[in-house]
Amino acid sequence: MVRWLYSTNAKDIGTLYLIFAVFAAMIGTAFSVLIRMELAAPGVQYLNGDHQLYNVIITAHAFVMIFFMVMPAMVGGFGNYLVPVMIGAPDMAFPRLNNISFWLLPPSLILLLASAFVEQGAGTGWTVYPPLSGLQSHSGGSVDLAIFSLHLSGISSMLGAMNFITTVLNMRNPGMTLHKLPLFVWAIFVTAILLLLSLPVLAGAITMLLTDRNFNTSFYDPAGGGDPILYQHLFWFFGHPEVYILIIPGFGMVSHIVSAFSGKPVFGYLGMVYAMFSIGILGFLVWSHHMYAVGLDVDTRAYFTAATMIIAVPTGIKIFSWLKGSFSKTFLANSINVLSEAVLTLRERFPRANLYPKNCLINNECIDLVPYGYYLTGTMHYPRYNIILQHMVSLTSYLYGVVVGLMLSDAWMNKKNMNGQARLFLKQSINNAFYLFYTFSLLSHYCSSYPYIVNSRGFIAVAFVTRTLTCFTELYNNFYENGKKCVPSDIYNMLTIQGLSHWICGDGTFVKGGGIYLQAQSFTVIEVVHLINVLIIKFNCKCTIHYQEGKPVIYISSRSVRKLRTELLKHMPMHYKLTGKTSRVN
């Protein structure tokens, strides 16, 4: 417990962000289920006609999903986990600041949930518009608690944004210029800038609302010379960049996933970077397209209509760059993965590229004035949250080997019938002991007993008994049949170049002549033949079966290793093996 409370390790904090986001997602989903149950049929269903309670549930659902699920997961979780690794930094620039930026979120969530139970609850909607959020409509302390919650969440996000900006600018590997940064790092960098510029405006807007409610000011009260439209301008100056704060990290994720599954670099790297910056800049210049119905003059509405349409240009650059990267020669060999990512890309971005009528409404003020408001739920949930969740799931699957440190390694597990726990056993050659201990340093905190080490003349092995965790149970159930390790039926789609590099790193041994032995002794001969066919078809490797002590191993020729060397070296664990003294590949 102390480790997680006081940790300054970026990966630990990233894990905390992801766990917190999952917890918040469950709360937000519970609110969503209540809303859908009430709307499932006409008339009063479950809330006894309490419209204030319905508004409170909608407000809590929106705040939880935006500020406590998507933002912590996309920026805090994946950002902390991947940005230092991608730029070669040992940690974030300000580790203790990183710690406090996370631990501000739990009290912020508690304040938000408390606001739903104080007096009649905060039934203002997520925009918190006055006069609905004023004393006349909400005289209790519920709205005040919601404002304090937003303050804490905003401080957390600003601290994290400063940390990311400093880390990217000052802690890159020597020789890594800005134009060599991975696109996901660029996405987090742009997102951090948007957070740093937009959140202070929101803080000022809700602080003035707080003083209107408690200190007799009249910033938004027309009776005292104020104007509630001022609040809308301030809120949407934050609110529209917030849309891109939520989705730009997804841009970086899609770029990496499409690149990996298409087997080629991202098309138009610089164009993608400048497109993200353009989207971020234009995001600050179009806020009033959310306010066409408040009585803006014609010239103002014409400007915001034109500016909103201009955002389609950098968005189009990104969508067509992704599609150009997807449809390559590798598309035929890896069609399922590439097609799924291409469809994901099309579904996500084409609506905002003015090709889907419902999402064109917000661009054109002449059309928007008539159906204003009815499509907002759809336009937030379909092209935003559904796609964001797909990004998170896709990236988690894609980075499984990086996070866990293993990719279908030559390990095996067995169940201990006494207590249902699993025993994980890894065996490596003596020369590869470094990778073995590196792997177990990642997994050691899951041990319920100290790892048992076996030294022999030709190999070293480590075994430990895991705690009863769902992940090990699923691993055992998915990759073992009758207690024996088996090759998954969809191994063709699962095995990427990154997975192959981890396989070589964990189970590969260089032999005389420059080839590689891939240990596959846990599998049957039929399964080994299937693996060889996958390597031949997918990676164009020349492979044959050899036998060691009567058990099959896969031999990859030196020519194939040379052909794959450039791709394999992109993955950090391969450097010591392909560039060290033991490597015979030049």
From Swiss-Prot:
It comes from the Eukaryota. Keywords: Endonuclease, Hydrolase, Intron homing, Membrane, Mitochondrion, Nuclease, Transmembrane, Transmembrane helix. One of its GO terms (molecular function) is heme binding. Residues 324-586 are annotated as: COX1 intron 7 encoded. The chain crosses the membrane at residues 15-35, 56-76, 99-119, 145-165, 183-203, 234-254, 266-286, 303-323, 387-407, 434-454. InterPro entries: Cyt_c_oxase-like_su1_dom, Cyt_c_oxase-like_su1_sf, Cyt_C_Oxase_1, Cyt_c_Oxase_su1_BS, Homing_endonucl, LAGLIDADG_dom. GO terms for biological process: aerobic respiration; intron homing; respiratory electron transport chain. Its EC number is 3.1.-.-. Residues 1-323 are annotated as: COX1 exons 1 to 7 encoded. The keyword Protease does not apply. It is a multi-pass membrane protein. It holds the Pfam family LAGLIDADG_2. PROSITE patterns: COX1, COX1_CUB. The mature protein may arise from proteolytic cleavage of an in-frame translation of COX1 exons 1 to 7 plus intron 7, containing the aI7 open reading frame. Its main location: mitochondrion. SUPFAM superfamilies: Cytochrome c oxidase subunit I-like, Homing endonucleases. It is found in: Mitochondrion; Membrane. One of its GO terms (cellular component) is respiratory chain complex IV. In the C-terminal section; belongs to the LAGLIDADG endonuclease family. In the N-terminal section; belongs to the heme-copper respiratory oxidase family. Mitochondrial DNA endonuclease involved in intron homing. This is Probable intron-encoded endonuclease aI7. It comes from Mycosarcoma maydis.
